[in-house]
């Protein structure tokens, strides 16, 4: 995934991890309202509703949330979201090239097998580390203040404390199984598709290794990822947000959705998921590639000066 020109120096692992974390946080800040809309649409239809309001479409959900609960509600859970990107995206994206080289061994050109293995490895490790931030983020996004409903949590750190003390510390890792499956799918599809598309565009002289190439590759990766991960993503959101006892397991959550709402329930929130992931990918990958190069140029300048 590292693109270098003749004058570029390959970025170090530290530069890649730092660049991935910063780029992911920037992408999260810009696209977070879409993520909140996605969560609200995904939990809509459960027998236990949060507010009685029906959300319709991406813009309709965002508009309804802003009007009924205030514009700031669109960013509820953002601190946990940024914590998630620092602990999660920085590892799954920043370590991808290094792990790919490990799996590739003596390969002159990384094979599809080594790319997939790298995506599986970095995605799996990142989920276990970042899962508590995901649980808090989803719960803050899902809770409503309407109709006299008392919010479960007043803020990010309050949510961590209440979940750990009233439910158990292990609840912070609730939904790890569907989230692990989701992020293995996302990581493999997103990074491998981006890597393959970018390589094909550059190798066939269709586009240079620059912003237009990164943008197109990120858009294609975003669509493929959303299509494959949507069913698991909806189950993950429902299970994480559910109160104790509503579902006995991840499969029971999936079966409940299937029997009560039908197979289309697994694609609830597809539009905001795609808009969010595609725009997130574009912002993140373009910034990631640019930041890596600028940091290495700055490092070269400092090295030359000394």
UniProtKB/Swiss-Prot annotation:
Q: How does it sit in the membrane?
A: Multi-pass membrane protein
Kindly provide the PTM information from the record: May undergo sulfenylation upon cold exposure. May increase the sensitivity of UCP1 thermogenic function to the activation by noradrenaline probably through structural effects.
Q: How is its activity regulated?
A: Has no constitutive proton transporter activity and has to be activated by long-chain fatty acids/LCFAs. Inhibited by purine nucleotides. Both purine nucleotides and LCFAs bind the cytosolic side of the transporter and directly compete to activate or inhibit it. Activated by noradrenaline and reactive oxygen species. Despite lacking canonical translational encoding for selenocysteine, a small pool of the protein has been observed to selectively incorporate selenocysteine at 'Cys-253'.
Q: Where are the Solcar repeats?
A: 11-102, 110-200, 209-294
Q: Which organism is it from?
A: Ochotona dauurica (Daurian pika)
Annotated signal peptide: none
Q: Name one GO molecular function term.
A: oxidative phosphorylation uncoupler activity
UniProt cross-references to Gene3D superfamilies, sorted A to Z: Mitochondrial carrier domain
Membrane-crossing residue ranges in chain numbering: 11-32, 74-96, 116-132, 178-194, 212-231, 266-288
Mitochondrial intermembrane topology ranges: 1-10, 97-115, 195-211, 289-306
Q: Name one GO biological process term.
A: regulation of reactive oxygen species biosynthetic process
Q: Can the keyword Isomerase be found in this entry's annotation?
A: no
Q: Which family does it belong to?
A: Belongs to the mitochondrial carrier (TC 2.A.29) family.
Q: At what positions is Cysteine sulfenic acid (-SOH) found?
A: 253
Its recorded name reads Mitochondrial brown fat uncoupling protein 1
Species classification: Eukaryota, Metazoa, Chordata, Craniata, Vertebrata
List residues binding fatty acid 16:0. Answer: 56, 268
Q: Which residues lie on this side of the membrane: Mitochondrial matrix?
A: 33-73, 133-177, 232-265
Functional summary from the UniProt entry = Mitochondrial protein responsible for thermogenic respiration, a specialized capacity of brown adipose tissue and beige fat that participates in non-shivering adaptive thermogenesis to temperature and diet variations and more generally to the regulation of energy balance. Functions as a long-chain fatty acid/LCFA and proton symporter, simultaneously transporting one LCFA and one proton through the inner mitochondrial membrane. However, LCFAs remaining associated with the transporter via their hydrophobic tails, it results in an apparent transport of protons activated by LCFAs.
* Alphabetical keyword list: Ion channel, Ion transport, Membrane, Mitochondrion, Mitochondrion inner membrane, Oxidation, Repeat, Transmembrane, Transmembrane helix, Transport
Q: How does it assemble?
A: Most probably functions as a monomer. Binds one purine nucleotide per monomer. However, has also been suggested to function as a homodimer or a homotetramer. Tightly associates with cardiolipin in the mitochondrion inner membrane; may stabilize and regulate its activity.
